[in-house]
């Protein structure tokens, strides 16, 4: 019976694909990523009516205006975003009540009857951090060994390489427009801590403190916190380095992986992944066109 249950669920979902409501779909997605979110989880509906019939699903790192427009063009009305819709972690809109940018974005969502759900805490908190796994797969690092234990997945042993070589490889494979590096370019690297997104000073420093770790790869970090910690560590002769990919670069592959999961979960419903793109550009090369189609 335990083997048949997932199959029966899939058959049920497929048979009622035309009558699946957003709230029901969201509940199934949360069940798929069975992580335990914090009590004050941000994994909630940010806009829209949960009773809306689902016509298609879009996953994305962040539901920018361009992502929302692309979703509408594709006929998708359930948006699964990893990061906030309204510019702050809790999506608190009190400050933006009379803001023209906020008002236009909200009006667009309402006009097109979109439902926006944030999938952040649960997709990270599952036994496997699916956002981390996504970028490991993108880099081909899923084959490399990790230490045992629940936090072991955030540490990986890679073939020996210099810091400069590692940075160039990451920039090339991930098409990073504004990659930043701190540390000795010739530092030998084989033990890596990888914290996608913006995990904050304490988690980043704790990762750097782990025995043998030479470099932390992160999405972003406060320049006056982790960045200065690494600067002092290097000045003290410690073999430490920092690579900042950019928040979107570090987490978009995980949400693309999410889209693959949802295609299996909802076999009768269109599921797209729409890349949010990198918001910042390097004046040496100019902005790269990465707007969603």
Segment roles from a protein language model:
Residues 3-12:
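Sec-dependent N-terminal signal peptides
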Residues 13-17:
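Sec/Tat signal peptide C-region and signal peptidase I cleavage site
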Residues 18-293:
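Active-site catalytic microenvironments in core metabolic enzymes, especially phosphate/sugar-handling
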């Amino acid at each position: 019976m335990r083997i048949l249950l997932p199959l029966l669920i899939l058959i049920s979902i497929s048979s009622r694909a035309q009558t699946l409501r957003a709230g029901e779909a969201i509940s199934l997605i949360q069940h798929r990523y069975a992580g335990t979110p914090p009590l004050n989880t941000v994994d909630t509906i940010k806009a829209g009516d949960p009773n809306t019939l689902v016509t298609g699903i879009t996953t994305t790192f962040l539901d920018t205006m361009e992502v929302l427009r692309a979703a509408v063009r594709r006929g998708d009305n359930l948006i699964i975003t990893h990061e906030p819709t309204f510019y702050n972690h809790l999506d608190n809109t009190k400050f933006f009540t009379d803001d023209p940018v906020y008002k236009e974005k909200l009006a667009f969502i309402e006009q097109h009857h979109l439902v926006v759900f944030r999938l952040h805490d649960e997709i990270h908190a599952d036994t496997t951090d699916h956002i981390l796994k996504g970028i490991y797969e993108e880099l081909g690092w899923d084959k490399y060994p990790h230490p045992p234990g629940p936090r072991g997945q955030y540490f990986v042993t890679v073939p020996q390489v210099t810091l400069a070589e590692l940075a160039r490889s990451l920039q090339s494979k991930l098409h990073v427009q504004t990659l930043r590096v701190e540390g000795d370019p010739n530092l030998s690297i084989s033990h890596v801590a990888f914290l996608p997104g913006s995990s904050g000073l304490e988690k980043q420093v704790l990762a750097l403190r782990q025995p043998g770790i030479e470099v932390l790869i992160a999405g972003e970090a406060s320049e006056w916190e982790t960045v200065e910690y690494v600067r002092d560590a290097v000045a003290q002769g410690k073999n430490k380095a920092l690579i900042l990919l950019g928040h979107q670069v570090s987490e978009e592959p995980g949400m693309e992986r999410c889209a693959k999961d949802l295609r299996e979960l909802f076999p009768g419903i269109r599921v797209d992944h729409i890349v949010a793109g990198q918001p910042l550009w390097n004046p040496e090369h100019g902005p790269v066109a990465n707007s969603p189609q």
